[in-house]
Amino acid sequence: GATVKVTNATFKSDVLESDKPVLVHFEGPWCGPCKMVAPVLDEIANEYEGKVKVAKVNTDENPQLASQYGVRSIPTRLMFKGGEVAANMVGAAPKTRLAAFLDASL
């Protein structure tokens, strides 16, 4: 139930070709709110194990992924299902809101 670090090189296999829905969290090392959300994402990854995969993208290291999916501010979460973006959520959010977002998009 751990979160997966995804890069430009692994995005296709880890996210687009995943047999499960993938929640992709776009973050950056300089982003305060991203650091606050990180432990919540780890909890979500454990609680939703088997139902959803949780992946993190460092936008500083993978700017092309951010621009490809129109991520302009971080943190942003995109829910991928079958290689397509099914839903998105911008900004820091408490665990209850993240869980509600997941439940609605699964």
Curated annotation (Swiss-Prot):
Residues 1-106 form the Thioredoxin domain. One of its GO terms (molecular function) is protein-disulfide reductase activity. The keyword Transmembrane helix does not apply. Keywords: Disulfide bond, Electron transport, Redox-active center, Transport. Participates in various redox reactions through the reversible oxidation of its active center dithiol to a disulfide and catalyzes dithiol-disulfide exchange reactions. The keyword Transmembrane helix does not apply. It comes from Kitasatospora aureofaciens. Belongs to the thioredoxin family. This is Thioredoxin. One of its GO terms (cellular component) is cytoplasm. PROSITE patterns: THIOREDOXIN_1, THIOREDOXIN_2. It comes from the Bacteria. InterPro entries: Thioredoxin, Thioredoxin-like_sf, Thioredoxin_CS, Thioredoxin_domain. Disulfide bonds join 31-34.
